[in-house]
Amino acid sequence: ADQWEVLGTKLATQFSNSIRNNFGFLNRCEDSDPNARDKTFRQEGRKVFKEVVPLAAAHIEAHLAALEQAPTAVRRYWLHQANHGMNQLVIKKLVGADAGADVAPLILDEFANTASAGSIIAFHKHRDDLAAGDLGVICSFGAGYSIGSVVVRKR
């Protein structure tokens, strides 16, 4: 069995109205239609994309900088698996170039969007080829916005 050292963890949240749901326990206190459009999940997809990409890239970059590591020193990025284009843009902002599945593997074709579990599934399925000493970043990001990352090194 392979072993991994956790070099650091980092969490961040930033409020956004681009993803929201106004339904909750306080709705019983107001005279409004419980089936109204604002009581269901809604998302402004393009706005979310434009807001999350720089947030995720900056989060990962700051996390690596705190550990005195450059984004280009990372052998593999296991990112949130909701949108291929979003992942590619995050990686491009980090390493300055397009990256293939060897650097940022995808599992969307096999599992679709598995929410925050996607980065862990990607890690599970795409880690065996790394050598001792290789660095990796596991990062999930999503609604609200929340971002969590773990920087690991293979032993």
Where in this protein do the model-derived segments appear?
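A generic secondary-structure signal
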Residues: 62-66, 125-126
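Condensing-enzyme catalytic core mediating Claisen C-C bond formation in acyl metabolism
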Residues: 1-50, 54, 58, 141, ...
